[in-house]
Amino acid sequence: GDVYKRQFIYRLFSYIDRGEFEQAGLWIAEHQASLIDKMALLKEQQQAEMSLYVALIHLGNGEYRKTRKRLSTTIGRGHLYSLPLFRTIRIVNVMIHYELGDVDYIQSEVRSIKREMSKNKGYNLKVESFLLKFLNYSFVDTNRKKRARIWESMAEEVHTLYADKYETQILRKFDFVAWVEAKIFEVPLSDILKREHASKSKWQRK
């Protein structure tokens, strides 16, 4: 029932938050037959939410083609565009193509997202603009010092995102800023998420 689905999603969410992608992969495998394979029976919004979290686990485990496949159905449903969840899915989809090195797709999708953003000004998110800006950078032949400078140049924007109540609703679903940091410094996403989770826990205990 619904409680079972919510528990499943909540567990996935907490694994992602802590950067525990391997354990999350095992959790998905355990529920493959009982839940994942029956996803088509769920309401559209529930399907989209579950697809997003399952896809993020694949992303964290470096299974980019699986991630792309998992999101492809939802991406085709443009009528959901104004929902924050769908916007998140669309950004994750561009991230996957970034991981796969699909430059042409990224450029065309970034243009398309920018067009949608200019049409839907009331729905625009700073985190979308932040990610689109990052996706325009090329890190080929960029040494560590240059990478660090790029990250420093983004610091103020990062601070603004974390301080904005509306933006943090999106970042709670998935910390896109952590993914950008992982890409810039060429470290595993799980390491950044574990560090962020530990600092959040410290803050919450004070």
Please describe what each predicted stretch is.
Residues 6-13, 46-56, 60, 88-92, ...:
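"A position-specific structural signal for the A-helix of alpha-solenoid helical repeats
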Residues 102-206:
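C-terminal non-catalytic interaction modules
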Residues 1-4:
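Short, small-residue-biased leader/transition segments that mark boundaries at the very start
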Residues 28-40, 68-79, 112-122, 159:
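Amphipathic alpha-helical segments of tetratricopeptide repeats
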Residues 64-65, 74-77, 83-92, 102-104:
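Active-site-proximal binding-pocket segments
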Residues 41-45, 58, 79-85:
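Short, contiguous acidic/charged loop-to-helix segments that flank catalytic cores in large enzymes
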